[in-house]
Amino acid sequence: MNLEPINNALSHLRMLRSSVGQVFETLGNGVRAEHGEEGKEQKFLQELQELLNGVNSNLREFETCINDLTPPQAPFNLANTAYLSLETNLERQALYPHLVQSYKWHDKLHEYSTFASVLLQQNSLKRSYYTNTKRRRSLPSSHLATPQTVDNLIGSIHFPNMNLKIVRPFMTNAILHITIARVLRAAVILKGLLIEWVTVKGFDESLLDGVDEHWTVSRHQVFRKVQDHAHSAMLHFFSPTLPDLAIRSFITWFRSYLTLFADPCKKCGKHLHNTLPPTWRDLRTLEPYHEECKQ
């Protein structure tokens, strides 16, 4: 629908209303002081005549624009909104222009969605008309490793003054027993190649007697501190894409406790702080620190 003739007619209508308003304003003011004393009535009539001529000119132009308009071929279907003109409540009458605007917006939305549907059905965004059935290879999961894989990984790790032993009390998941010289012993509970729990005890404490011993903490505070730090390191070295590297890094870090009671703190230079040796080992340099000195 061409809206240019309608906009042109509305523009001339505004000009006509403005010129008529000037006529009534001039009549309301009457003869003014600016007309002077001599011939003021004649000047007033001349001014009024010019305004009326402008009204006639605007009226002819407006009629010409009206004649250029083509009536709609069919009446607009407004459904139940056509009865709003019969409503006397001003609050309900205010809904009419908003509903008309909503209908126009809905028509444009339907038109644009139709064009978009036609373009999308042309399949122009695909490189091929055939569906590729090749699926991406799934990454191996670290907790689904076979027992042979775990045995080969642990068997390839060798450090002096450290003994590694694998037991399987439940036939599936392995428990790695670590003995570091005559300093401490630890039980690392594995689920595939994923470290789930670490228990640290003294060399003279029971750890291999039964499964329940793997979940009880040490009676010595120093080894309880080491166990807490081991849990932090377990989370730090966790890597779902490189689980073998995570286990190697954790065992390398844990072996640094070989000098638990020998090396002083790297920061304060003391062996004891609050009656405890340096129980923290730096995750990169493996240097010993007291828990209060590591910050």
Swiss-Prot record:
The Gene Ontology biological process terms listed for this entry are: regulation of transcription by RNA polymerase II
The UniProt entry's GO CC annotations, sorted and at most eight, read:
mediator complex
InterPro entries from the entry? Mediator_Med27 (IPR021627)
**Gene Ontology molecular function terms on file:** transcription coactivator activity
**Compartments, as annotated in UniProt:** Nucleus
Q: Which Pfam families match?
A: Med27
> Any idea which UniProt keywords this protein has?
Activator, Nucleus, Transcription, Transcription regulation
Query: What PANTHER family does the entry give?
Result: 34 KDA TRANSCRIPTIONAL CO-ACTIVATOR-RELATED, MEDIATOR OF RNA POLYMERASE II TRANSCRIPTION SUBUNIT 27
The entry's function note states: Component of the Mediator complex, a coactivator involved in the regulated transcription of nearly all RNA polymerase II-dependent genes. Mediator functions as a bridge to convey information from gene-specific regulatory proteins to the basal RNA polymerase II transcription machinery. Mediator is recruited to promoters by direct interactions with regulatory proteins and serves as a scaffold for the assembly of a functional preinitiation complex with RNA polymerase II and the general transcription factors.
User: What protein family does this chain belong to?
Assistant: Belongs to the Mediator complex subunit 27 family.
Q: How does it assemble?
A: Component of the Mediator complex.
Q: What protein name is recorded for this chain?
A: Mediator of RNA polymerase II transcription subunit 27
Organism the protein comes from: Aedes aegypti (Yellowfever mosquito)
This protein's gene is called MED27
